[in-house]
Regions:
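An N-terminal hydrophobic leader/cap segment in hydrolases
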Residues: 2-55, 66
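Alpha/beta-hydrolase active-site loop
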Residues: 89, 120-141
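Conserved alpha/beta-hydrolase
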Residues: 94-116
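Hydrolase active-site cap/lid region
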Residues: 160-212, 221, 228, 261
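Short beta-strand/loop motif that positions the catalytic acidic residue
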Residues: 225-227, 232-234, 238
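Conserved alpha/beta-hydrolase "acid-adjacent" motif
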Residues: 239-245
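Catalytic histidine neighborhood in serine/cysteine hydrolases
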Residues: 250-268
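Catalytic histidine-centered segment of alpha/beta-hydrolase-like enzymes
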Residues: 265-279
């Protein structure tokens, strides 16, 4: 009888480990998409940005993206998508920002879209993509103020990046404070209240697979290094990143900072959900910090003929 109990116990443990391995593959496996073949109707040019050499062999692979030029003095905004997505996710934001004179750069993070990569690393290698993209904007548009908007993984990559210059404005949407909470929330959501019990095994496997300590993937440990005006956005119904977690991030960030908790918002495209209010809040924040010389938000209408760097 004891023999069968031991066999059953080992079988259960083996199933748990196999399940954790499967989830690890699901979470960290690459998500390539032939983005350039899509018809977007958006006047952007394809760009390949030289990567920054890191610890992994593919860290210096070029970052693929779309660049849409704005009006001179209007500012440039980097747009960074969420996990298992690509630059197309940020198109609606790019359209309204570009319509108000902002230049925009939409990128595919490594192992997403058309940017090469073997595994998603939850901000570690992705932060190098952000650094390379910000350097590209700084080098090519030296007279422009530069801001960044990131969603979920994209937000974490912005926080974990170490750009060589100060950003003028940063907007972070639906960002987890720690990788542990991100994993536990998702396990609870999909496997019920006992799901988080798998978290230690899953995090250990991820750490082994990626060669990265989980402690390196905690935005809350680095958000105070973000020396830029900050707007944090989250939804009241977000079960992936809870309101209390966003409030902790807000407390850890340095001034100047603002927070917008969207009633009814979940872990999805906040622009699609909040629509005009989202656009008004984003433009108000960016205009205040990237266009102090402007008395009103009329730059797109007044400078439509003054497209720069043609």
């Amino acid at each position: 009888m004891y023999r069968w109990l031991l066999i059953s116990l080992f079988a259960c443990i083996a199933l748990l480990i196999l399940g954790a391995i499967g989830i690890t593959e699901l979470l960290s496996g690459a998500a390539p998409t032939a983005v350039s073949t899509l018809s977007t109707g958006f006047p952007a040019e394809p760009v390949q940005i030289p990567g920054i050499r890191g610890n992994a062999a593919d860290d210096d692979s070029p970052v693929h993206g779309w660049l849409a030029r704005g009006t001179r003095g209007g500012g440039m905004v980097l747009l960074v998508h969420s996990i298992r997505s690509n630059r197309v996710e940020m198109l609606s934001r790019a359209r309204f920002l570009n319509g108000h004179g902002y230049g925009v750069l939409l990128i595919d993070l490594q192992a997403h879209g058309e940017t090469p990569g073997t595994r998603i690393t939850f901000g570690a290698r992705e932060s190098k993509n952000v650094e390379a993209s910000l350097a590209f904007l700084h080098d090519n548009f030296p007279s422009e103020k530069i801001g960044a908007i990131g969603v979920s993984l994209g937000a974490a990559a912005i926080v974990l990046a170490r750009p060589a210059f100060r950003l003028s404005a940063v907007i972070l949407e639906s960002m987890h404070p720690t990788i542990e909470e991100a994993v536990e929330n998702r396990l609870r959501l999909h496997l019920g209240e006992f799901g988080p019990a798998l978290s230690p095994v899953l995090l250990s496997l991820l750490s082994y697979r990626l060669g990265i300590s989980p402690a390196e993937l905690n935005p809350i440990s680095r958000i105070s290094d973000l020396n830029a005006p900050l707007l944090l956005i989250s939804g009241t119904d977000d079960r992936h990143t809870k309101v209390a977690e966003t409030e902790r991030l807000f407390e850890a960030a340095r001034q100047p900072k603002e927070i917008w908790i969207v009633p009814g918002g979940g872990h999805f495209n906040m622009h699609a959900y909040a629509g005009r209010e989202y656009e008004d809040r984003i433009l108000d924040f960016l205009d205040r910090h990237m266009r102090e010389h402007e008395n009103q938000r009329g730059i797109a209408q007044h400078r439509t003929e003054e497209q720069f760097f043609r």
